[in-house]
């Protein structure tokens, strides 16, 4: 053994060939700050070996290196810029030393090589991979850019276009694509990986492969003519601005850095990467996006913990076909849980099966599946008009019309048709679960399971605990949702649960703005372009359905009369009375026509102004800041109330439910992250300017207490120790 650290070791393999093996104590290798320092120490030893002829880099885990340790990021981002820059310089000096070894080097890469893991293997001369490889640089999705030389080495290896496509989008690619673009030199079976890597290394040592020529382009400026460079970077910048937009500075910064470094050698180019990385790491966007990653891990970890002692349902059933039922049935079958889909109408069953078939056909068209797989999945969805097959299902989700009487009747009838241990769930979006449970003999086996439309795209499933719901029931439904590839978040029961409860105060803020003379077009524009929502409130209401929103608004008003009962006729009422139900019938706030792809495209419709004039004061202009404040304060206040009342368990779960269920702009990180970034004291000052607008604008007492001490909702993060000192670690 030449060197042994906590996460890697260095050993002789055979005659003059050393192996450097990443082998962290946990289940995966991460390139954390300690591992980077340890890599430097291993290289100290390696550089002193006079008999060294070659070096093989590999991993002892199922994945090579999953990336940097993102749990370190928030504390690293708080380190002063100069110190962070120093540490990056130190880290890059380690990778440069790996690249500059006076012998040929190869990485034997299995599984994931992401972020720092990818940057590490880019520093070796050759890369041999297994078929399960996923390699790439996802940093821009975390609000930063590659910091260990990825933006320097990858363009010089692959060419600017291929590298920018991976770096700007935060992409990873599989083995076949990686070999095609030159990111790896070959792909072999896992059992042949080390043997194959050694064979390449021996050829390089013997002079059959020119490893110095392979290394040289990574040390030199990018080989691009002036015209090629102009075209390449102009197109890339245009595309990045179009897709990422102004709210995500990392992708455009990465492209501009690659452009600026194109005519420089490696060491000067790395200085530019350093200069670009450090300011990005100090942005609110980076903190928010890293926060989302960490929250996602927290939520998924909680789901794993909840389900560790229960068996995942093997057979499921859906009550109510149609678009939603068909979507749930498809998702369950697609992920390997056969499903019985029941409806009382042949027409609805056909609609549900058509929806499932349509989604499978899309997978077929994209080349994700073949005809055999399509037939196999569709055959596991059994459409029935009666209860045949219900005696063998483990879980049933009801997705019939949003009417308490209908739902109660269907649930009570179904309870008599299933085994005593079968779990029942309702896909209601607003009706309290404890109310629906009142007709059941086994309320402990019942909970809410709120999917979001379209089911196959929306990651969130709210799992709602009723008054009498057992822990085992919650665990089984969470297990099924996880098996379906969803992110389940457990919430306690109340009208609207969490997501709809906080959405309708937002819609109420919108209605009040319209009442006071604001133009819905401007509101949509401000909330989309300035705040960053994927859809403005008018557009979102049209997509949800004005009739659906009108009904849900009444349910929410009955549930929270003090705040959500209104004493005026609003825009939703006016459109509902005029039979303008949104996208579903082509007329809402906007008019909809099908585009060439058969998707609804919104257009302006002057008729709506006349309808809104009846429920609005004369038109007046509001500033962007006023619109954002009046829209967001009711939502934020309600989110805080939900935390204070125990409807949602933590700020992390609240933020993930908003991002995954409503499309809350990820660069804000969610409601609590946005609140912490703004500062509770500043938020209180802003909200108090609008408290005359009514109870929705009154800040909850718990938030007032936080504001008095300017406390955050997320635990305070301490800056990492002066990371420049890691040079001597």
From Swiss-Prot:
Residues reported to bind NAD(+): 324, 343, 400-402, 407, 429, 453
Tagged with keyword Chaperone: no
Keywords for the protein's UniProt record, in alphabetical order: Fatty acid metabolism, Isomerase, Lipid degradation, Lipid metabolism, Lyase, Multifunctional enzyme, NAD, Oxidoreductase
Ranges that cross the membrane: none
GO cellular component labels: fatty acid beta-oxidation multienzyme complex
EC number: 4.2.1.17, 5.1.2.3, 5.3.3.8, 1.1.1.35
Pathway entry: Lipid metabolism; fatty acid beta-oxidation
GO MF assignments: 3-hydroxybutyryl-CoA epimerase activity; delta(3)-delta(2)-enoyl-CoA isomerase activity; enoyl-CoA hydratase activity; long-chain-3-hydroxyacyl-CoA dehydrogenase activity; NAD+ binding
Gene3D superfamilies documented for this protein: 1.10.1040.50, 2-enoyl-CoA Hydratase, Chain A, domain 1 (3.90.226.10), NAD(P)-binding Rossmann-like Domain (3.40.50.720)
Complex and partners: Heterotetramer of two alpha chains (FadB) and two beta chains (FadA).
HAMAP family noted in UniProt: FadB
Family: In the N-terminal section; belongs to the enoyl-CoA hydratase/isomerase family.
PANTHER family: TRIFUNCTIONAL ENZYME SUBUNIT ALPHA, TRIFUNCTIONAL ENZYME SUBUNIT ALPHA, MITOCHONDRIAL
Name used for this protein in its record: Fatty acid oxidation complex subunit alpha
Organism: Enterobacter cloacae
Taxon lineage: Bacteria, Pseudomonadati, Pseudomonadota, Gammaproteobacteria, Enterobacterales
